[in-house]
Amino acid sequence: MTAAFDRYVSFKNADWEGKSQRVMERLQIHIDAAQNPFWAYFAQKRTELNQKQGLDDLRVLHNYLPTLREILEDNGDQETLAMLEDLEVTCM
């Protein structure tokens, strides 16, 4: 009998789901503002990756980490950038 694999076992007590959700909530502000074409693309890819490939938001954020970091820096959104960096250090 094979045990189910949990790739997030090392994140126990790291609240990766909560941290991912809070970062996504902050990013939604940028998506709604639609000041950069990337945000519409990112929102579409998030939906596709979540629904079609079964990837969670932590994986979606990881896939776009360099681009997100650059855009958040350019926008001066230090709060979301700090949240994203914390997520990267503790959970990626």
From Swiss-Prot:
Keyword set includes Glycoprotein:
no
Q: Which GO terms describe its biological process?
A: nitrogen fixation
- What keywords tag this UniProt record? Nitrogen fixation
- Source organism's superkingdom? Bacteria
Q: What does this protein do?
A: Is required to sustain N(2)-dependent growth in the presence of low levels of carbon monoxide (CO). Probably acts by protecting the N(2) fixation ability of the nitrogenase complex, which is inactivated in the presence of CO.
Q: Record's family?
A: Belongs to the CowN family.
The entry's protein name is: N(2)-fixation sustaining protein CowN
